[in-house]
Regions:
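Short, flexible helix-loop junctions that flank or precede catalytic/ligand sites
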Residues: 1-186
Length: 186
């Protein structure tokens, strides 16, 4: 779904020689020399929560937790954020607002969610039309209005539909594009 790529590109943007970026992951998906990376190892009881606890001893500025799956990990992420660390992580939710619901369902008190959460980014990867065979077509006002509801947006002058060719193995699609929902908090 691209979560790791988004997390890593964000961390790479934030990482400088003066900033100590630490990660706890399961598994480490990309080795990055500018990060201090640690892998979850359940066989020695090193889970996400224990990893965050260990990382806090390394004086990190930024901590990336591969995934918040339970209250113990959420609590450690909250504690790290409360002590001045920027914490980035992933949660399995369908959209940005549901991330708050998910944290509350895990058992994080609402006042701690309010005190520590600075923003949520939800993302989806969608297929892109094959540039070799996509076909121009007339936009359908009814379909467009249903797609952009509840907003009113002008009908585009040109839209495309999939066709299929050798380049895309007759699917009409080639590649993926991220669609992001950003929900900042103040």
């Amino acid at each position: 779904s691209g979560k790791t790529t988004t997390l890593y590109s964000t961390l790479k943007t934030l990482a400088t020689k003066e900033v100590n970026v630490c990660t706890i992951e399961d598994p480490i998906e990309m080795v990055e020399s500018s990060f201090n990376q640690m892998q979850v190892q359940e066989n020695i009881d090193l889970n996400f929560a224990g990893g965050v606890k260990a990382l806090l001893r390394q004086d990190p500025d930024i901590i990336m937790i591969g995934e918040i799956r339970n209250l113990e990990t959420a609590d450690m992420a909250i504690q790290a954020a409360l002590t001045g660390h920027l914490v980035l992580s992933s949660l399995h939710t369908n959209d940005a607002p549901t991330a708050i619901t998910r944290l509350l369902e895990l058992g994080v008190p609402s006042y701690l969610v309010r005190a520590t959460l600075v923003g949520v980014v939800a993302q989806r990867l969608v297929r892109t039309l094959c540039p070799h065979c996509k076909q121009a077509t007339e936009p359908d006002a009814e379909v467009w209005n249903a797609m952009v509801k509840p907003w009113t947006l002008p009908l585009p002058k040109q839209v495309y539909k999939p066709a299929g060719c050798q380049e895309c193995r007759e699917t009409g699609f080639k590649g993926r594009q991220g669609i992001y929902e950003v929900m900042p908090f103040s």
